[in-house]
């Protein structure tokens, strides 16, 4: 089954062109099934690009998914037209009465700030608490993952001496995990962050299981079974050119930046990078969506009650 998104959302045409099955709202009404309700709390400045990345992966599932775009209420996005936000987004306050089968919390370019110094930290704390009663499964990504694991477990983040930036080899630490079904023992993941969480701090919490790790970049993915939460500290959702876009943005702005590790062919930024993580990104999101489908209550109003 395809993903259901508004017909006029910019991601619609992009995904159709890529071969992702996208369903119009009119066609969705004709299908007598309950689509999975997935919320995307988009904290990134360029929201349209992030919408496409996430919708591409969520929409590749054989299940019908309805994606709701959500933003922080009091925060203005600098790189997304206000008209786009008004047309396609709701604030969290506007959806907090709803139940979601799955909920994605993205990263944000604020990782060098202390959590308490983030202008919308109070709302983030409320959202984290709300997910425990209104969301069946939460996928936290990059800064969203660091913030969530700090909120729920007090796991700190540490500033790196230089930006972790590039494509790095990772190991599958739990081949039997439902979220890593079909994964190779060794695979590659894009990394782009100024901070990290550390294995030693996570291991203090037996309820957390580390599923993916890199010898160079540390922990990539952790799972919390009791809270039905995933913490993805890197960027499997990235496009082929995402790291290049970040690199050239910094170069053009005069910001010191090294070439992304193992990304450009022959370390030549004039050559187009090859995407070596796409298949595992689809596997990961497909496994997550499938597990939601297998375990979420048919009655959305029962979400949160089973874990209570």
From Swiss-Prot:
Substrate binds at residues 163, 192, 249. The keyword Membrane does not apply. InterPro entries: Class_I_gatase-like, HST_MetA, MetA_family. Pathway: Amino-acid biosynthesis; L-methionine biosynthesis via de novo pathway; O-acetyl-L-homoserine from L-homoserine: step 1/1. One of its GO terms (biological process) is L-methionine biosynthetic process from homoserine via O-succinyl-L-homoserine and cystathionine. GO terms for molecular function: homoserine O-acetyltransferase activity; homoserine O-succinyltransferase activity. The record marks 111 as: Important for acyl-CoA specificity. SUPFAM superfamilies: Class I glutamine amidotransferase-like (SSF52317). The active site is at residues 142, 235, 237. It comes from the Bacteria. It catalyses: L-homoserine + acetyl-CoA = O-acetyl-L-homoserine + CoA. The record marks 192 as: Important for substrate specificity. The keyword Transferase applies. Keywords: Acyltransferase, Amino-acid biosynthesis, Cytoplasm, Methionine biosynthesis, Transferase. It is found in: Cytoplasm. Transfers an acetyl group from acetyl-CoA to L-homoserine, forming acetyl-L-homoserine. HAMAP family: MetA_acyltransf (MF_00295). Belongs to the MetA family. PANTHER family: HOMOSERINE O-SUCCINYLTRANSFERASE. This is Homoserine O-acetyltransferase. It comes from Agrobacterium fabrum (strain C58 / ATCC 33970). The gene is metAA.
